[in-house]
Amino acid sequence: APLFVEYEDVLLRRAAAAKTPDQNEQLLVQVKDTVEVSHAAELQDYFQDDCVTTVASHRGVGTLAPGTAVVYPISFPDRLELLLETANGLKQVRVPVAGEKLTKEIRSFRRLIQDSQSQNYLSSAQTLHGWLVAPLQQDLQGAGIHTLVMVADGSLRTIPMGALHDGRHFLVDSLAVAVTPSLALTDLSAAQRRKGSLLSVGLTESVEGLSAPRYAESEVQAIRTLYGGKLLMNKQFSAPSLEEEIKDQGVGIVHVASRTVVGTEAGDASVMAHDGEQT
C-alpha cells in the first residue's frame, strides 16, 4: 500500500542520517515492523480472513539462530533498500537501481527461466544477484551465514531466489534459501518432525490435457529419501485421499509435485490432482 511505502521511505532516510547506532537501530526496527504489518495486511486481504495474523508473535532483533540471515528487499521508484537482519542486529544497504528497472529485470528472468531448453536466463540471474545478494556478501560471509531467508514483496515473490547466479555458482549452491511473505507469521521454532509425518503427492501422468511437471517423480523421490513419509502418486492422488491422509494420519507437511495456479484472490488458486483441478 502506498502509505506503508511512504512511511518506510521516511524511516529509511532517517536511519541513514541517524547520528548514533542506537537511533539507527530503533529506526530500522520500525522499518522491519512496518514491512511485516504491510505484508500481513496483504495476506488478510488475499485470504479475506483476519485470523491469518493470529499466529504472529513479537520477535526482538538479535533473536535469529546463528547462521541465519533475513533480508527485506524494499523497492522505491529511485532505489532499492536491503534491510539485513542477522543475530548481530539490523543493517541497511542502499542499492542504486530504480524500482521500474528492477521489476523489468525480474519479469525478464521469470520469463526466460521457464524455457528449460535455454540458459538465456543467466544474464538476468547475474544482474539480480548483483542487486539483491552481492551488496550483502561481505556481511553474510563475516557472520557465517548458511541460511538466507528472503521476505519478498511484489514481483520478487514470483522468482526462485536460489537460481540467482554470481557468475560461477547459483545462490543455492552456497546457501540454503527460503522465501516467505512474512517472517512474523512464520513459526521459527524447530519443528519436531517424525518419520512418516511428511506426505508427498504428485502427478507423472497427463490429466485433462495438461502434462505433468517434467521432474515430478525425481523431485518426490529426492524428498522422500531425505524425510521418508507416505507417497500418493497419480491415481492415488485425489482430493478425497488427500483429505483423508491429512485428517486421519496426522500429516505435518505436504509436498506437492503437480501443476498449480495461484490467482489474484485465494479462491482462484488451484492444484491439479488425478481427479481434476482442486481449489
Across the structure, where does each feature detected by a protein language model lie?
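Helix-loop-helix
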Residues: D115-S118
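A structural signal for alpha-helical segments
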Residues: K19-Q26, N120, S211
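Catalytic cores of enzymes
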Residues: A56-R110, N120-T279
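Acidic, Ser/Thr-rich low-complexity linear motifs
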Residues: A1-Y7, A15-Q23, E42-H58
